[in-house]
Amino acid sequence: MKKIAVFKQMPCEAADAPPAKTDLLPLSWPAKLELGYQRVKMRTVPVLRRHQGPLRVQKHLYPEGPAVCQHMILHPPGGIAGGDTLDIQIHAGSHAWAQLTSPGAAKWYRSEVSLARQNLALSTEPGGILEWLPQETIFFAGCQTALDTTIDLAEDAKVIAWDIIALGRPASGERFNSGRIYQRFRLRRNGRLLWSERMQLLGGSRLLESPIGFAGYPVAGTLLASGELNDQQLTACRSLPIEGGRGGLSQLPGLVVARFLGEETEAARNWFIALWQELRPALLGRSVSIPRIWNT
């Protein structure tokens, strides 16, 4: 019987969920982005692009040829303040392949009262493929933030997605000693839950230093990839060097999960890219083409 390595979920602060939207102060700057993709013959074509407020995408690109459509998501203000909301919905039709990334870090600023929110929903039809590969997210000390991510996969659909977070600004000596982060992440296939995680982290919490929490590291990351690796592929992934931190990779039923803890976002990004270079051909059947924006 094939052994399955179990990598435990990071513990989270026991606390109530964030207040309902009706309890919040009036929203200061709502933004919404809807993207949809369809496969037309051998080409993935963007068929829906709707936005409201300061969320945009650049012109779609085909650096790998017509099968994979690449979009870069832009948030021109450069940061999210208290009361702001970001609502992002991305859908890949049957056998469409969309890759989404960003030009720079997402920054969540200090807020005295109002909660800032992001709702991200990724979904596919049968055979669709989504790659969600953003740059890191920086939580400034004093931020009040709630992030809710859902991924809904249809039969035979595939996804690779990662999330890299930085608590405070470690390069400037700023620690996450105040504020609150509420984060929920769910991944389902055909309505069946494959992955669910909730975290509420309070600034200055003991979890920041605890060996069963962040262990004193200011940077954390999670990578999810649908599918299952064979023993040789698992060995190749686990043999990749991790510099500037520590990490692990587990094969769960129908899902590969990688975790990172470290000092710098660059270390997390480098390891995740190295994993992506192994996982993409193994699970998606196509070698990696590095987005040009990552080299600038």
Curated annotation (Swiss-Prot):
Taxonomy, superkingdom: Bacteria
Pfam families: UreD
CC annotations in GO: cytoplasm
Alphabetic keyword roster: Chaperone, Cytoplasm, Nickel insertion
GO molecular function (one): nickel cation binding
Cell location: Cytoplasm
Entries under InterPro entries matching the protein: UreD
Family indicated by similarity: Belongs to the UreD family.
Stated role: Required for maturation of urease via the functional incorporation of the urease nickel metallocenter.
Subunit structure: UreD, UreF and UreG form a complex that acts as a GTP-hydrolysis-dependent molecular chaperone, activating the urease apoprotein by helping to assemble the nickel containing metallocenter of UreC. The UreE protein probably delivers the nickel.
Protein name: Urease accessory protein UreD
Species of the source: Nitrosococcus oceani (strain ATCC 19707 / BCRC 17464 / JCM 30415 / NCIMB 11848 / C-107)
